[in-house]
Amino acid sequence: MKVRMICMILLISSISVLSACGSKEKNVEKNDTDVLPLNDSVPGWLESFYNSDYEYRKSTFVLENDIEDTIAVVEGKVEASPYKEYVKIVEPAESSWSEVWFYGDGDDVTAILNIENDYVLQNTRRFYPYGYGSNLSLSKDRTEEYNGIPCDVYTAEYTVNLTGQINQKSGEAIITEPITAVVSQEYYVDPEQDQLLCMITDASDRQEKTEIANRVMNDNITVEEAQKLVSVDEVTKEKMEILSYDDSISIDIPEI
């Protein structure tokens, strides 16, 4: 259960952005904020997703011994421009906060958390959906039905430079050895509407490599030594379902 709680806190976007706040130890946030400009190879349905207002549900689940267990669910909505986002926790009920609002320009944004009906203001980094800004090489893998809709399923994978991200955020070379992780994705696209309906991300390798990075930083050991201590047998995935695209979405930021 301890490993699963760590996965839950660190892998869901909003939780991952906020989880390290107030922590005394150095821990890697498992968010995906190493952002590059969109390039000409990005398909229309993906670029449209990045620039649309929409509602979504994210579920983080683990697969172990052929048993799938959903460990966290959040629901949210996004206003693309100017950026606003609202997230509420559906599961687990014992979370320290129940809902959060994000707003701001660029990568540095403001978050307002509802903690037991008391608002807390924090500065944080904007979280982007997995794959944003990466040089994705998408390929059509198959056709599969999703919620009764025949979808084209595209696959992609990209490499995350964890060493570079950690050192950039800290402003110094905390880790001197390379640590990289491969993130694999599946995109379910409605070809009739040319819309992204669902994105499934396998973050298992990133989960393991992040645990290795945390060991290197907190235990002052080498990457090779940390690899011997870390063993992640679970497959960790995040499923992001687009519930609706809606230009009329309006997010009211609480006044505090």
Where in the sequence are the language-model features?
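Bacterial N-terminal signal peptides that target proteins for export
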Residues: 1-7
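N-terminal leader/targeting segments and the immediate start of mature chains
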Residues: 2, 17-80, 249-256
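Bacterial N-terminal signal peptides
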Residues: 9-17
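Short, hydrophobic/aromatic-rich segments at coil-to-beta transitions
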Residues: 51-57, 81-88, 147-155, 171-172, ...
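Beta-turn initiation residues at beta-strand->coil junctions
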Residues: 60-65, 88-93, 111-116, 158, ...
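An acidic-aromatic
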Residues: 68-132
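Hydrophobic/aromatic beta-strand elements that line small-molecule binding cavities or substrate pockets
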Residues: 73-78, 100-101, 139-142, 183-189, ...
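Gly/Pro-enriched, hydrophobic low-complexity segments
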Residues: 150-256
